């Protein structure tokens, strides 16, 4: 298969999966096989006339919209039944060398919406992009799923290349790094693997937490990190947790990740969520009333990915039902999502209440200055759960427990994390409290 088309289609699938019900996605979208691409048209293979009719009538808008977001181009879509229709010729074969960076064109600094939760991370990313290996090296970005870490990493890559196209920039997930290493070992191509990763100017590696516990991957990345750092090359890393909280990560890697600058990204506040939706509508020329965007932003507070997915669902619902977009229609379009999101709200308050109830304390005890073990131990568990079950930053967690310093929170999380590995009783306690919180 054409590698360029394969890359575009895989990214399109990821986008569509977040915008459709699981049944619809599995029934209709997963039956599609990308066939060919030229300057104007993408040909998609489908198994039968029935599938073709449904896709053309119900899902062509969604697919075209997703393709436009991924490729920044308006492709025509042609649904073909391979056994009946000749395959369109491929215009140009894609090679790794022609696009080594693997950067998503829609993730730039221009499309990034700055808010209170990401202002520091954005400033740090821009500083690194303006002066690779001279400002902060490595730059370590961390935060929950869908908060913009990957967007900032791609934005750095785009900016660097816009200033100096001759530089070698590579974005890769830790999973891809691991898989390529496995293949290199299997095929006896270790030297080719090392040459690829140690001869670039800017390495952007996403979701580094997944290499924890993979000894061979950690070993290889350790030497890759050293080679790049000693050659004065820029390294940008992302994770869902700060280095100290990544379980099973080797200490030598953890210490290196802390050499440069660590910046966290918190969930966006209401104003930022509204701004994100306005930006998306502007970029894609969508006509969405302001009160609808305010409604969506108020109801979907989890992360940016779900926020944009909710807007896409409203747009698709309007198109398919031929209804004007308004708040009532948005309520109908998002009813499944809103029902699920209302079920459980997990924040510091619900966690403190659950822990206090379990240990027969008052929530004020957890926020107090008392240091006796009957209070300090439950407090440490509550801090650990805040870190594990929410996207709160360390300083914010400290504030919620009587204004304690973030280092106290780090100590509590590390202690509970270590004790969980050695105590079956503590593991049962924590799991029971979690069930009480989630209603599981």
UniProtKB/Swiss-Prot annotation:
Pfam short name (any one): Bac_DnaA
Please tell me one Gene Ontology term that the record gives under cellular component: cytoplasm
> Please, which domain of life does this record's source organism belong to?
Bacteria
- CDD domains from the entry? AAA, Bac_DnaA_C
SUPFAM superfamilies in alphabetical order: P-loop containing nucleoside triphosphate hydrolases (SSF52540), TrpR-like (SSF48295)
Q: Where is this region: Domain III, AAA+ region?
A: 102-318
Which GO terms fall under molecular function for this chain's record?
ATP binding; ATP hydrolysis activity; DNA replication origin binding; lipid binding
Domain IV, binds dsDNA: annotated segments? 319-440
What keywords appear on the UniProt entry?
ATP-binding, Cytoplasm, DNA replication, DNA-binding, Lipid-binding, Nucleotide-binding
Give the residues the record marks as binding ATP. 146, 148-150
Q: What is its main location?
A: cytoplasm
Quick one: where's region Domain II?
Answer: 94-101
Tell me, which GO biological process terms does this entry list?
DNA replication initiation; regulation of DNA replication
Q: Where in the cell is it found?
A: Cytoplasm
Q: Where is this region: Domain I, interacts with DnaA modulators?
A: 1-93
UniProt xrefs under InterPro entries: AAA+_ATPase, Chromosome_initiator_DnaA, Chromosome_initiator_DnaA-like, Chromosome_initiator_DnaA_CS, DnaA_C, DnaA_dom, DnaA_N_dom, DnaA_N_sf
The entry's free-text remark on domains says: Domain I is involved in oligomerization and binding regulators, domain II is flexibile and of varying length in different bacteria, domain III forms the AAA+ region, while domain IV binds dsDNA.
Q: What family does the Swiss-Prot or TrEMBL record give for this protein?
A: Belongs to the DnaA family.
Listed under subunit, the entry gives:
Oligomerizes as a right-handed, spiral filament on DNA at oriC.
Role this protein plays? Plays an essential role in the initiation and regulation of chromosomal replication. ATP-DnaA binds to the origin of replication (oriC) to initiate formation of the DNA replication initiation complex once per cell cycle. Binds the DnaA box (a 9 base pair repeat at the origin) and separates the double-stranded (ds)DNA. Forms a right-handed helical filament on oriC DNA; dsDNA binds to the exterior of the filament while single-stranded (ss)DNA is stabiized in the filament's interior.
What protein name is recorded for this chain? Chromosomal replication initiator protein DnaA
Q: Which organism is it from?
A: Ruminiclostridium cellulolyticum (strain ATCC 35319 / DSM 5812 / JCM 6584 / H10) (Clostridium cellulolyticum)
The major lineage groups are:
Bacteria, Bacillati, Bacillota, Clostridia, Eubacteriales
**Gene of this entry:** dnaA
